[in-house]
């Protein structure tokens, strides 16, 4: 896949972890559109502001979808690569 090119996450580059905000979702990663379950990974000094904005812009995801998302994230990498 991708002619052998390997993805290098921005946050893994020296000096970038404290300057990177990673945003992801189950909808895109596992092809379950409409679930609206996602997350961010950010430095502590930024994540507080993200949580404040999130409180006013979104509603909570249904509990069964959160449980399904946790199960999907715990799946082996082989499951994910089969989706590609």
Task: Please state what every model-predicted region is.
Residues 1-6:
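Catalytic PLP-binding core of fold-type I/II PLP enzymes
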Residues 13-84:
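Conserved core segment of the aminotransferase class I/II
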Residues 8-12:
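Rossmann-like dinucleotide-binding domain for NAD(H)/NADP(H)
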